[in-house]
Amino acid sequence: MGSVLYSLSESANLYPASELFLRHRLQIVEELWESVLRQECGQNMVDLLRQLRDLCSPEGQATKDQAVSAVKLIEQLNINEAIRAARAFALYFQLINIIEQEYEQRQQLTRYSDLEAETAPLNGSENITSSSNHNEDDVIFNRGLGTDFLGKNWTNRGQGKQKGTFAALFPLLSKLNVPPQQIQRLISQLDVRLVFTAHPTEIVRHTIRDKQRQVVDLLQQLDEVENRAKEGGGYPWEAGEIREKLLEEIRLWWRTDELHQFKPTVLDEVDYALHYFQEVLFDGIPQLYKRFKYALNQTFSWLEPPSKDFCSFGSWVGSDRDGNPSVTPEITWQTACYQRKMVLERYIKSVKQLIELLSISMHWSDVLPDLLESLELDQSQLSEVYDALALRYRQEPYRLKLAYVLKRLENTRDRNLALYKGETPTNEDSPMYRSGAEFLAELRLIQHNLTETGLSCRELDNLICQVEIFDFNLTKLDIRQESTRHSDALNEILDYLQLLPQPYNDLSEEQRVAWLTTELQTRRPLISSELPFSDKTNDVIKTFRVVRSLQQEFGINICQTYIISMCRQVSDVLEVLLLAKEARLFDPAIAVGTIQVVPLFETVEDLQRSRSVMRQLFELPLYRALLAGGYKSTEVKVPSPESTPLPTPHSVLTPDLQEVMLGYSDSNKDSGFLSSNWEIHKAQKSLQKIAEEYGVNLRIFHGRGGSVGRGGGPAHEAILAQPGHSINGRIKITEQGEVLASKYSLLDLALYNLETITTAVIQASLLRTGFDDIEPWNEIMEELAARSRQHYRGLIYEQPDFIDFFHQVTPIEEISQLQISSRPARRPSGKKDLSSLRAIPWVFSWTQTRFLLPSWYGVGTALQEFFNEEPEEHLKLMRYFYVKWPFFKMVISKVEMTLAKVDMQMAGHYVQELSDPEDKSRFEKVFEQIANEYYLTRDLVLKITDHSRLLDGDPVLQRSVQLRNGTIVPLGFIQVSLLKRLRQSKNNNATSGVIHSRYSKGELLRGALLTINGIAAGMRNTG
């Protein structure tokens, strides 16, 4: 029986024979989906969905006539039928997401196995000669661009085999004769950091995520049964039984509410983020290290692997207070305790397993004196354990030792639980671990004894690796706060103390820097223990104090980064240093600190002046000494806190390292996609040059979002497109809440994601193309970016009708009512303008309406104006850029992917139906301007890529987008209908038309929010 969306015959042209497994899985899920709907809603609903879907082509893009027909169908629905249809389409998208994820994981496993066999013969040092076509270069670049290295496209070489794996990367480096000493130097300093954030919080409820995991587990069981059946094993009834379980699970899912019942608290978001560590990453990261070590040994057996924490994790969840009043100092403290609770529970579980495993008897194995001595010390400190277990384990020293270890861990956990609750621990005198280092030392003692007596234990080795990576803290917490919060706090403090003749905020930048520099070197405290200030100022002060408390309790490693959002000038950084000094996080007398101040440059103007800001900072003796580790030493020496941190390379501030964060979201909202990407690219190059000039190592922190409009997209390609000198083995990237499920829900997908990021960092650092340094190319990009920005701002900021257009034709107001994040959608001003609107709901709204405007608008006009100068030559030049220049290819590829998801006919339907009658004519003009830019951009991108259709170069992605587009269209019609009725109801002007009968605002809002959920699932991102 054909499915509602596609029968196999209908989708045969979408999926080639090599993807029969995926087609088979899609068929199973579609049949299950249809069965659920038939049982839960009846055959009439199934028929309705088929009718709605049949109005659109498999590629989407509903015509005007089709839109009219769909609306007529929807007009006949009551509210319950409309909601059921919306839920059905949303369920379909989430099931398809599961299938595609599982298929991708399966493909990665297969490809990794194939690559290991494929690259085995490549372990020699065969030379690769350049395949450049010098004649073509000379023809195209008669403007001084035809240098010898232009043809050596090292970044693209080997891409067919690379696929982002270690197994292919190291043979590639060998073939290209990269000096092993360079590889070793890079590996030794390799530092890849992924930072989890909570906004936009994943729109899918945790409860629904649990249902999805059950479906994934059952599908994997079905794989095993089907594979056994192919080999002639198993039982005929097994597959049928699993399908019945799948049907039951999906029916339970159908009867579960998709919408969040309440706005999540910050600790809810913490729990959500930590889920991925609990389920996947805690066990997965050690496997990443083993994979790296094995692949390196296959090609460069004499090189040393990186430190085990070469790939580490940070978090903003519970510590990012920029615009989120719910993140308080108390919440940040609880977050650290919560993280420790989770990691301690995992260690306790592992130690219990080791007790069962290490049943080695002294009758049959030697025991070294150091283990026996430690047991004597344990007996004196934990006599209750000895009394309870000494008889049982009298000949089993490893079990007895681990029993002592277990008790110390449990005492540590109990103390941490009291701290989490805000209580005074009652077991302070009990033996416990004050740091992960103490726990690690005991594990290594056991490991040493096993090794010396000819034994090994993989479970123990794995636990040691986990402790080395995660310590007792799991992740590092970054503090983030907006720059004006610090200046406003100082303004109030100084006004209270009457230290300045005028308000601090009235000082010029030069006056601020002069006063701050002097005050930083003053030993007297500025802020007393009592805080007679406003709540906002007290919150800023308490934040620094809680960082100090965190470092004392959990070690410096727990929280040593303070990010200043909307950083614009030197005083923004010095203000944070002064407040850190007041909390004893920085000692200006010796220029030593335990906190790293990280400026975040976000707008285009701030990106452009970032180099000047950093130069001024590096010129300040106090700041330069802080980076070096103090006036008298190049090594950071800090007073040991009560809890000694784990001695890893990142335990203290790394000497001569400056971290700078670059924001993709606000720069894009400010100037458009092309201009934003180019300004960030330029900023990286200029920041690297200034850092080299002052002998400072630079780590760029990329504030990427999940969507293309906020810097999202494939991380591997994005890293390869960065200026090579800006990476040097170090990178830090945000992982937004909305993408965590797609990247980290399944172990093999998580490993592959981390592996591709790491290989890209290594490749970009060692195989630099030099294309970013070709000045004529840069001049062309400068022109394109400027033209794109002008056209973008002409619409967004200068078109007088645009703000009203945005608020009427998109569901921005309804999105703000989704209970998906603890963070408000708007900045505190509360104005309905673009400056107060955050980048996330801005992008979310355009995604819902199928415009996806922030990710492409302005690109077409910029290209067209460039082509108009010399059409043939400039088209040839752009095609050459696309083939040779990783940065340009990344930009065009992202635009192409976004354009493939745009449906301008559907977007026009939003404009026609949601515009107020008196505004329709002026809004139609705005829409016409947007539509013209879309078609222009699409046509020129196709010319540059030399594709007949969008995404012809990536057929797998093309098929996925087509499959989704066709079903998002009817869901969009339902959304428009519900939004129109809802807004009429709000205006007390309800009339018949869109959905018959009268319904409460609550019912209509619920229906609209369900469609938002569904479209987000179909588009696979929110903002």
Swiss-Prot record:
GO CC terms: cytosol
Pfam families (UniProt xref): PEPcase
HAMAP family from the UniProt entry: PEPcase_type1
Protein name: Phosphoenolpyruvate carboxylase
GO molecular function: magnesium ion binding; phosphoenolpyruvate carboxylase activity
Gene name of the encoded protein: ppc
Residue positions of the active site: H199, K669
BP terms from Gene Ontology: carbon fixation; oxaloacetate metabolic process; tricarboxylic acid cycle
